[in-house]
């Protein structure tokens, strides 16, 4: 393929440049996307499957090369290895944006790889990665139903900003990443400072205009240079197979839908599927293959569930479309943790635990912008027993990381300033039961655990997951969706926030986009559900506890002059290690001179403060010091009153009586109380022990 390029101007100094034909020419599709000096490369390749499967084997891997920012990994191994949390989150964003664009029953193994090759420290690469991956797929042989593009939207100074720079984003009240087609939205994810539903909708509409512009440009490029699409890899569903399967299960599945609990419904559904396979699969007839029959069974189940909702307004568990599952809350739940809550909504349960600590508990990370440390982080755990299964235990998967980060963003906007609450905060959400919406249960349980721990949050936060049944030109929004509604429905729209406004949101769909009107209805219904949940939460715990747990460490801060930081640290950290050893406290010094002292007892904190003040304090005339005799002369003794601050106590100032032999009165190394009488023009200190006796 010859070198080809096109560009899309989004705003001043924000032009997307797409290039192909120079790099990775053996890939099915390969595109380099540039904006300023940030360059992101994306490739798309597909392979035939050795056997047909009932899912789409599609994988996206995004990697940020440290060399792109002129850096090298700080670890022992300098080669990029396991993906970072950020790389996993961006990979998920790309996957969720692109997956709805593929035809149903596409029998290909598809891989998209994206690399940040150059990073200017200003232009954020994730929207470029979505656009580049979409363009690479568009010009490849991989079949798609639609063209996709992605953008980021910010709100800076009351104005919407497209693809905000890093500096603009730090000042923004909104961080929204969204993807869609030229006419509809496919994926959104973001967090914000208590924006209203109307503002979020306005932001999405703003971003959609730019998405349409990029999609139109990619589509024109595809028509001009794209390869022939391989639609032969898409399996059709024979109409008679679907009809036979639907007729076979109609009455039986209607009976199964009468079961109101998850376990009974799943068991009945499993037995029905086994019956369908045993009775309808025909080895001699390829139309009635195992793959086709199983796919038809899933479609038939979905259609019956939808019909129940559309015709009767009743869901599989008996609820109405706006009804929230029963909620129970127990806080505190665990006796020795700093804060805890057992939050149960229907058959979804989160045991949330809050742990408070000093600076050494911060979550360290390394990315293209340098090293950092998170003062608040939420870790989500989804053990297999939560859904009654046997499974792998180990490092978190992409789903766990994504769910945890969404809940973390939802709660981060209500946390107090560090100056008011200097603790590092770790939240963990242990999912002990799951039947849909476990990430939003993590938000609710996590919020209550924070309040139980005495974290002075600005307001309680609750979360809810919304679903969609889109059929017969009718859109039905479902509140607080269960697992089967997520699995068989068309949308999963999670919204979290306070009574005042939204703090986080995430939407994934399984169809080719939804309209502004549907999102407006979903957000309005989510607000009603959120208000209901918040009301139940505040009935149990109306406000944060006034004090932290007696089991939490005590933390105090003190301010020193920045010129004294080196004195406190000492050569090679010798001085600060001595302070930690002598006091038993954890001491952390910031570049601005703020010192955080954490310990299990107040005595340890007081000791650490005393030692630090001794190193950094300035001498005051008239103040009494418990000094140390450093040397003895015939005319007096030299006494160190503060580290590095030494003065002379003349022999006449040692006692009210005459002292003939100083060595008989005091020895080198002895402690001696002295009062600072004066400081001469040379900075020399005049001390008196006699004055302390007079006092």
From Swiss-Prot:
- Name assigned to this protein: Polyribonucleotide nucleotidyltransferase
Task: Tell me where in or outside the cell this protein is found.
Answer: Cytoplasm
Species of provenance: Chlamydia trachomatis serovar D (strain ATCC VR-885 / DSM 19411 / UW-3/Cx)
Q: Name one GO cellular component term.
A: cytosol
Chief subcellular site? cytoplasm
Write out the residues that bind Mg(2+): 486, 492
The answer on whether this UniProt entry bears the keyword Magnesium reads yes
Q: Which reaction does it catalyse?
A: RNA(n+1) + phosphate = RNA(n) + a ribonucleoside 5'-diphosphate
